[in-house]
Amino acid sequence: MSDSLSNITIERKHNHVEICLHEAVGFDRKSAGFDEIEFIHNALPEIRFSDIDLSTTFLGRKIGAPLMISSMTGGFEKASLLNRRFAEAAEHFGIPLGIGSMRQALENSTQKESFAIVRKYAPSVPVFANIGAPEVARGLSASDIGILLELIEADALIVHLNAAQELFQPEGNTDFRHVLDQLSHLCATVPVPVIVKEVGCGISGVCAQRVLDAGVKVIDVAGAGGISWQKVEEIRYVRQRERENRFSPEALDDLLNWGIPTARCIAEVSDLKKHTVHTDFEIIASGGIRSGLDIAKSLALGARIGASAGQLLNAAHEERLEETIETWLNDLRAVLFLTGTTSPDKLQKQHLILKHRPIL
């Protein structure tokens, strides 16, 4: 990889974090869908609040709570500090940590420390490597896979599907041919479970079944409702080229808000366990998770754990990451108590009701 291309990637990574922290890049025409559902109150919970246990299991590992610090950053100098903060918080709470795209670890050996630092500060929790679908489509060598996994002693490998982001990205790679074939090969050869995630446009039930057929063990739905990476890349495009993107004004707003709401994604993907041969995969709910209440709703819809990137990035930047996570876990404890459930694993769809369902 040439120095110029590597430098472009470094600058892009830096821009992503800066834009997410300082610009309005959320969905403004749709929500994650959690506002459409609420829990049925249990006036007789018959439990003691102090008996509530948030611990659960994920990919066969016990974790302290059903929350993951989701994939966000790495591959540039200042990412080391952010990833250290993420790692320290993950270790403190005993929760999984996803790493940002590790393409830079393959392109530029000088940027490896920004990824490797997470295992130094999170030695005992599940940590997940991450690479993009375009890189998978081109075929990852055994050496590439070894670098990704060994650098952080990864417990799983995330493959992120980001077609909309690549479409808007000034230097984006929009060749998504052969992703599924190469994903199947990856699942058959990699020594750790493979997780497939979107980055904010969601994964439908139909798409989920295709990647499960390929051998994927976990689906992170990453639905619409949180960060719109189309907006992030649109800002970069305008800054670089000093003009609007190549789409018509009539279509642009819809494309910037393109995606399936997170709650719908969870419900669709979860239903596959009832209607297909795939019964043992796990679901991560991300995309617009803003509280422990959203996590609770995700679990009741069928997710195993919830995850957040954007909200926790802001918290880490403001040095209040552990405080934010603790608040979210308190939210979750409150929901468990008020539904009469003593653990996250016991939340079910029957605890939910559509807000606008007719009374009679």
Curated annotation (Swiss-Prot):
Keywords per UniProt: Cytoplasm, Flavoprotein, FMN, Isomerase, Isoprene biosynthesis, Magnesium, Metal-binding, NADP
Its localization reads: Cytoplasm
* UniProt main location, coarse: cytoplasm
Which GO MF terms does the UniProt record name? FMN binding; isopentenyl-diphosphate delta-isomerase activity; magnesium ion binding; NADPH binding; oxidoreductase activity
Using the UniProt record, name the top-level EC class of this enzyme in a single word: isomerase
| Short name of one Pfam family | FMN_dh
SMART domains linked to this entry: IMPDH
Keyword Ribosomal protein, does the record have it? no
Biological process annotations from GO = isoprenoid biosynthetic process
Which InterPro entries does this UniProt record tie to the protein?
Answer: Aldolase_TIM, FMN-dep_DH, IPdP_isomerase
UniProt keyword Ribosomal protein, yes or no: no
Q: Where does Mg(2+) bind?
A: E166
Q: Which cofactor does it need?
A: FMN; NADPH; Mg(2+)
Catalysed reactions listed for this entry: isopentenyl diphosphate = dimethylallyl diphosphate
Assigned EC number? 5.3.3.2
- The organism's superkingdom is given as Bacteria
Which cellular component, as a GO term, is one annotated location? cytoplasm
Binding positions (substrate):
R12, K13, S101, M102, R103, Q165
The entry assigns this protein to a family as follows:
Belongs to the IPP isomerase type 2 family.
Report the protein's function. Answer: Involved in the biosynthesis of isoprenoids. Catalyzes the 1,3-allylic rearrangement of the homoallylic substrate isopentenyl (IPP) to its allylic isomer, dimethylallyl diphosphate (DMAPP).
Q: What is this protein called?
A: Isopentenyl-diphosphate delta-isomerase
